Amino acid sequence: MAFLKKSLFLVLFLGLVSLSICEEEKRENEDEEEQEDDEQSEMKRGLWSKIKEAGKAALTAAGKAALGAVSDAVGEQ
């Protein structure tokens, strides 16, 4: 009976150890995924700001060109 008791405790102990190792690995994987998501978000934010700046520059140039065309048309009359 003592042999079975020791065996059972050993199995339970090893099960708990392996479970804690699995949970630790799972946490590490989640941390890595979160870090990758953060990096991707930063890249998207950087890309979006560049697109936004390019759009502003294009609108400014188009506005100046339209204003110049209108002033030329008014000047011709």
Curated annotation (Swiss-Prot):
Signal sequence, start to end: 1-22
Subcellular location: Secreted
Gene Ontology BP, a term: defense response to bacterium
Post-translational modification Valine amide, affected residues: V74
Record region (Disordered): 24-46
Pfam entry (one): DD_K
Tissue-by-tissue expression: Expressed by the skin glands.
GO CC terms of this entry: extracellular region
Entry keywords, A to Z: Amidation, Amphibian defense peptide, Antibiotic, Antimicrobial, Cleavage on pair of basic residues, Secreted, Signal
Propeptide stretches in the record: 23-43, 76-77
Composition-biased stretches (Acidic residues): 30-40
Biological role: Has antimicrobial activity.
Family membership noted in the UniProt record: Belongs to the frog skin active peptide (FSAP) family. Dermaseptin subfamily.
Protein name (database record): Dermaseptin-B8
